[in-house]
């Protein structure tokens, strides 16, 4: 068993599940979308992104691209959340949180593509 591949797979899967945990629930209900889950998703996705820099294969480049998309989407979601909460004194509203969750859903899709690539790479691996 290769420890590097275990750690890589762990962070790819963790990035997808933490992001999914943030986006699940009613789109316009702010009580169902914890901001700390969004921040955790950003941190885990950045760690997964850093781990993907070492792979120089074509599938590694696609892994890196999916991670870049996910991180950019999550950073945009966090920036939007910060803007909405700091621009007025009221709590975040339904339409505002739905914009944040929509961006995080885009990142979840990128994480799903990364998971599919990881499984495809694992299935096609042949022992020597």
Regions found by a protein language model. Give the residues of each.
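Hydrophobic alpha-helical membrane segments
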Residues: 48, 64-83
């Amino acid at each position: 068993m290769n420890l590097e591949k275990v750690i890589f797979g762990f962070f790819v899967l963790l990035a997808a599940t933490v992001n999914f945990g943030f986006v699940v629930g009613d789109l316009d209900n702010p009580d169902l979308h914890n901001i700390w889950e969004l921040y955790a998703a950003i941190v885990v996705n950045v760690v997964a992104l850093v781990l993907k820099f070492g792979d120089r294969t074509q599938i590694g480049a696609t892994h890196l691209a999916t991670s870049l998309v996910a991180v950019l989407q999550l950073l945009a979601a966090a920036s939007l959340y910060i803007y909405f909460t700091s621009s007025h004194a009221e709590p975040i509203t339904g339409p505002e949180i739905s914009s944040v969750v929509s961006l995080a859903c885009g990142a979840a899709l990128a994480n799903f593509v990364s998971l599919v690539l990881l499984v495809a790479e694992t299935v096609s691996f042949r022992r020597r």
